[in-house]
Amino acid sequence: MLQPKRTKFRKQFKGRIHGAAKGGTDLNFGAFGLKALEPERVTARQIEAARRAITRQMKRQGRVWIRVFPDVPVTAKPTEVRMGKGKGSVEFWACRVKPGRIMFEIDGVAEDIAREALRLGAAKLPIKTRFIQRIAE
């Protein structure tokens, strides 16, 4: 699964997701993409599950680009532990996704296969998404 190789600090504040995405809103690599429509924290497991669903549907043809990276450590205290005594340990890594952000791009397959692959990938994500494609020039 995706996670940073090293970080400056082990733990982070929770933070909030405000506004729309500034960058990463256009297709840069592939002909088809999956665009986020809601703000949400997407975990590394969800990104990996979506990637597997997409590549399985494409039958290993074409190419997949993951345009988001889980760089936010999410901490949790063990169950039945009293409050206090410091912050919990890092449980998993997540990525803050803003509306308008391209999450996945694919290329090298027909539109109907791409549409179905991204639909199956979107089912693994906790947000509403939209299928987009590059405008023919």
Curated annotation (Swiss-Prot):
Protein name: Large ribosomal subunit protein uL16
CDD domains: Ribosomal_L16_L10e
NCBIfam families in UniProt: rplP_bact
GO BP, one annotated term: translation
Organism ancestry: Bacteria, Pseudomonadati, Pseudomonadota, Alphaproteobacteria, Hyphomicrobiales
Subunit relationships: Part of the 50S ribosomal subunit.
One of the record's GO cellular component terms: cytosolic large ribosomal subunit
Family (UniProt): Belongs to the universal ribosomal protein uL16 family.
GO MF entries: rRNA binding; structural constituent of ribosome; tRNA binding
